[in-house]
């Protein structure tokens, strides 16, 4: 089985400019690169600082301002999934930007329930709010989701994700800004869960299965 190392970025919501948010993302990218990660997932609306206080989301950012993340994905041979507003059905909703080594511009998707991808596949499958296993690309082996939840919503979400991983036999990586980011394997077993604070939750897949680690960032 091929080696695969993935990570979830976790940090408290922060209100700064888009330029500063991108710079903050790059700090996590460099930390993930030092761990030789091939995938890095950020929390929901990470490019807005994971800020849910606004009643209505702003328009999507100018994609040229995200060029540093495109360059980082190419430089470090890493797929990066960040959260941002997207236009969908004539309104602005939560979405994701996927920066990949093989892309010159980010792929933009509505976030919905999350996204599935595989170790060697270049396909990103966005999963609907009520996911069905048959809708997933068979090459997908990891489901990723970015969130910004506190209790009690976080506990309910974690239970759903654990059930999802077991039901559809797929590993699940959750990046949650407010703590308790986690990784479950394809059997629904919890591999690693973070506490609170600024950190990388790292998962490694090998012939022995999934293993996890927590890397604090200061």
Swiss-Prot record:
Domain CN hydrolase: 4-207
InterPro entries listed in its UniProt record: C-N_Hydrolase (IPR003010), C-N_Hydrolase_sf (IPR036526)
Pfam family of the protein (one): CN_hydrolase
Protein name: Uncharacterized protein YobB
Source organism: Escherichia coli (strain K12)
Gene assigned in the entry: yobB
